[in-house]
Amino acid sequence: LVTSRKQKLNLKSQSNLSTSTRLYLNHPNLWSADSPYLYHCVTTLLVGNEKITMTQSNFGIRTLSLDPVNGLQVNNKTVKLKGGCIHPDNGLLGAVNIVDDLNRKVQLLKSAGYNALRSAHNSMSPELLEACDRYGLYVIDEFADTWTQSKTYFDYSVFMDNQWADDLQSMVLKDYNHPSIILYSIGNEIPETGTNESAFWAIKFIDKIRSLDQTRYITNAINPTLSNMDKLPQITESLKTEIPEKNINDIMHDFKKLMPVINTHPITSEAISESADLVDVVGYNYAAARYELDHKDYPNRVFIGTETNPRDLDNTWKQVVD
């Protein structure tokens, strides 16, 4: 037992009461991916000497800081995030959360040299978060894959307008006591991030998150090319480049060669600037070409590679380290 406290409360019949208390630890063991030390908290409600209910939870103690010079710091030490995106990948297991399976998954990722995970593109389950707490993985928890513009039939865009506040609150309250959570992502490859509509929704989401949790940072996983699909004719015209009519494989090959140019084009930079400025950390999907550009043109901007091609890992990791 490292610390304890009793608190007296008077509660009227048929009424509700919220309260808080503080406990102090001298020289606590700090949580990090390298040393995932967890404390166990037991809260018991007594009426007289009779135990009415008891809850138990684990938590970790650590600090976070962020700036363009030192990047992300955990417990005052700079951390380079090397991670992956977890999509629904349980195969035959389906959507059920099996603790042993999740523990195995996290341990395999740790043994592969990863220190971070991003939930793609929905909020992470409590069971997976507990595994990340236990074995030491930093987590980017993601809110949604769509806002108002749909990507497929009957996706979240159908419900977003009425559901976003409740869903964001559920995510943040679920995550709050997990030391592995370092970033909230408000979206993945949202088409609106290249439009004036982006700020309207992003500000709502950011304000809601910060009303519930001011201890974590906020990002948005932006794919600059997908954010500017409506501007591609203007961009390609300025480059005096056209994508000729070929079979689909040749077209995709040519388009991939153009993506770095599109991602760093002044039209693209201007279109995503408002979305980028609203968050603490800009998330870039498949936009490693912007890393050096952002350091030069936006020296106060902090960014993270939220999705990159696995085949480019050596090159992108070299950019991170350098």
Where are these regions (language model features)?
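Secreted/periplasmic carbohydrate-active enzymes, especially glycoside hydrolases
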Residues: 1-131, 135-139, 167, 182-183, ...
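Substrate-binding/catalytic cleft of secreted carbohydrate-active enzymes
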Residues: 107, 116-322
